[in-house]
From Swiss-Prot:
Position of the signal peptide: none
Protein's job: This is one of the proteins that bind and probably mediate the attachment of the 5S RNA into the large ribosomal subunit, where it forms part of the central protuberance.
GO BP terms: translation
NCBIfam families cross-referenced by the UniProt entry: L18_bact
Organism: Paracoccus denitrificans (strain Pd 1222)
GO molecular function, one term: 5S rRNA binding
Alphabetized UniProt keyword annotations: Ribonucleoprotein, Ribosomal protein, RNA-binding, rRNA-binding
Name under which the protein is recorded: Large ribosomal subunit protein uL18
UniProt GO cellular component terms: cytosolic large ribosomal subunit
Length: 119
C-alpha cells in the first residue's frame, strides 16, 4: 500500500523525534516549523518544559521580505542564534521534524551554525 504525502511526513517526524530522544543528553532542542507561508523556530528545554528563545518570519523587526524563502530562513537562523546566545544556550539538538534537510531548512541550520550555535 502506497503512503500519501502526509503519512510519509508523520513517519519521518516520528523517526527523527525518536532519534533525538536517544541522543539529547539534556541539551535544548532547536525545533523548526515550516508552513506554506511562514517559518518559525524555537529553542526548547524539554527537561523544564519551557521555550528559551524563538524567532519567526511573522516578526516585523527581522525585516524578512518574502516570508517563506531561503533568504528569510537564513535571517531567521541568524536571529535564533543571537537570541539563544543571549539566553545562555550554545549547544542544541536540531529538530527538523518531518521536514527534509534541504532548501529552507538547510539555510536556517547553516545560518544558525554561523551565528554560533553548535549542533
Amino acid at each position: 500500500m502506497a503512503l500519501n504525502k502526509r503519512e510519509l511526513f508523520q513517519k519521518r517526524r516520528l523517526r527523527v523525534r525518536n532519534k533525538l530522544r536517544k541522543i539529547s543528553d539534556g541539551r535544548p532542542r532547536l525545533s523548526v516549523h515550516r508552513s506554506s507561508k511562514n517559518i518559525s523556530v524555537q529553542v526548547i528545554d524539554d527537561v523544564k518544559g519551557v521555550t528559551l528563545a524563538a524567532a519567526s518570519s511573522l516578526e516585523k523587526d527581522l525585516g524578512v521580505v518574502g516570508k517563506n524563502n531561503v533568504e528569510a530562513a537564513a535571517k531567521i537562523g541568524a536571529a535564533i542564534a543571537e537570541r539563544a546566545k543571549k539566553a545562555g544556550v550554545e549547544e542544541v539538538i536540531f529538530d527538523r521534524g518531518g521536514f527534509l534537510f534541504h532548501g529552507k531548512i538547510k539555510a536556517l541550520a547553516d545560518a544558525a551554525r554561523e551565528g554560533g550555535l553548535k549542533f
